[in-house]
UniProtKB/Swiss-Prot annotation:
Domain of life according to the entry: Eukaryota
Residues covered by the Peptidase S1 domain: 31-253
Protein name from the UniProt record: Trypsin alpha-4
Removed propeptide positions: 17-30
One biological process term in Gene Ontology: proteolysis
Reaction(s) catalysed by this chain's protein: Preferential cleavage: Arg-|-Xaa, Lys-|-Xaa
Keyword Hydrolase on entry: yes
Classification via CDD domains: Tryp_SPc
Organism: Lucilia cuprina
Class in the EC hierarchy, top level: hydrolase
InterPro entries given in the database record: Peptidase_S1 (IPR050430), Peptidase_S1_PA (IPR009003), Peptidase_S1_PA_chymotrypsin (IPR043504), Peptidase_S1A (IPR001314), Trypsin_dom (IPR001254), TRYPSIN_HIS (IPR018114), TRYPSIN_SER (IPR033116)
Keyword Disulfide bond: yes
Keyword annotations: Disulfide bond, Hydrolase, Protease, Secreted, Serine protease, Signal, Zymogen
Length: 255
């Protein structure tokens, strides 16, 4: 999420792609207003790592497939990517596996952030356990006001160090129509492939990108973008899994 123009420039350069003014993907990891947790409470959560450092989150779809955000996989090769799963800590524990291939949504647009979703195929299958479990994709978008949870790793305040332990925050779903209304500040930037979530003083932020927004025990969103971190009247924006479900199912079988 956007903090300042300097941050916008830095992330734009790192991504190697155009980023619209005021809009920044969540690349560096922050759960604002959240608390520490363990992987057994969020066993679908993974850490997507570039060259040994946490880069983005993701969700276990099945033993070989991870769902994440397309903006997490721009200008990168599989040779520098690994996935750590089954650990509460991004930098230790669990099992680390290489990435064999990935596929971004063909309609992903880094300027508008539409269709910000991707699938990753791992080089070896996961063994399911109490700390590694797949999460089902929702078949319908949750109702406006429904309870939801987002999880991830990262700093909890601007300029802070990255905590090693997984964190989560409870939010409320803001439906697409409501998120685009005058109640909030986005207007026409909210597209059919997006859903929002918001609670005053709580949010996902840079680096939680690609991570899971869960409601009713199902994956309903993928952390995508927003203005600021827990800024008033600016919900976090997520790829809408209900709207993109058909693509995910197809891509998972062909990546």
């Amino acid at each position: 999420m956007l903090k300042f123009v300097v941050l916008l420039c830095a992330i734009s350069c790192a991504l190697g792609a155009a980023v619209p003014e005021g809009m920044v993907p969540q690349l560096d990891g922050r759960i604002v207003g959240g608390v520490a947790t363990t992987i057994s409470s969020f066993p679908w959560q993974i850490s997507l790592q570039r060259s040994g450092s946490h880069s983005c989150g993701g969700s276990v779809y099945n033993s070989r497939i991870i769902v994440t955000a397309a903006h997490c996989l721009q200008s990168v090769s599989t040779s520098v990517l690994k996935v750590r799963r089954g650990s509460s800590y991004w930098n230790s524990g669990g099992v680390v596996v290489s990435v064999a291939a990935f596929k971004n949504h063909e309609g992903y647009n880094p300027k508008t952030m539409v269709n910000d979703i991707a699938v990753i195929r791992l080089s070896s299958s996961l063994t399911m356990s109490s700390t590694i479990k797949a999460i089902a994709l929702t078949t319908a978008a949750p109702a406006n006001g429904a309870a939801a949870t987002v999880s991830g790793w990262g700093t909890t305040s601007s300029g802070g160090s990255i905590p090693a332990q997984l964190r989560y925050v409870d939010l409320k779903i803001v439906g697409r129509t409501q998120c685009a209304s005058s109640t909030y500040g986005y207007g026409s930037q909210i597209k059919p492939s997006m859903i929002c979530a918001y609670t005053v003083g709580k949010d996902s932020c840079q680096g939680d990108s690609g991570g899971p927004l869960v409601s009713g025990g199902r994956l309903v969103g993928v952390v995508s973008w927003g203005y600021g971190c827990a800024f008033a009247n600016y919900p976090g924006v997520y790829a809408d899994v209900a709207a993109l479900r058909t693509w995910v199912v197809s891509a998972a079988s062909s990546v």
